[in-house]
């Protein structure tokens, strides 16, 4: 929170708070004091978040706990946030029209917080801790690699499961004869296939004499029929 960029952003936040509170003007010295107070408050929240993280609280719940503790659920209403965001959009559109800037200009460029054609990321790199920035970039790259590997493994496993399911459901195919009676050439699934095997189990040892069952079905020449049991 000590960099020049962070200080400018905090000053803008203080000015916005004062403006919404009804103050039209403020002294530079008062603005500096309020900025320091806001900086201290944010750092205080950061320390509390780290302590909660050390206690095993998942990140998704930390912000909710802080909001409930600091503001109370009744005072932190969604309509207020939506109204604030709409106001920000209105301000940005007004500045776009007022100064004839391009639509690609961000609010930071419009308010002259960022130099022309400068990127926020590079300004943060110049004003912040370089080691911290490099560590964040490294974590982002590692996370992208893990996501790519997970996606690849998921696709491969899904294809393998789909292939096995298709073989299992249509192991017995295009049967001509069942128990000596002609049948339509249809695909038979696992349930019917197992029922047929159970009927033959009393008189035929399937594992030792597959030829007997093959003659009954008259389709042993179609190797696809019993490939799951060879």
From Swiss-Prot:
GO molecular function: protein heterodimerization activity
CDD domains: HFD_SF
InterPro entries: Bromo_TP-like, Histone-fold
Name of protein: Uncharacterized protein ECU05_0510
Organism, scientific name: Encephalitozoon cuniculi (strain GB-M1)
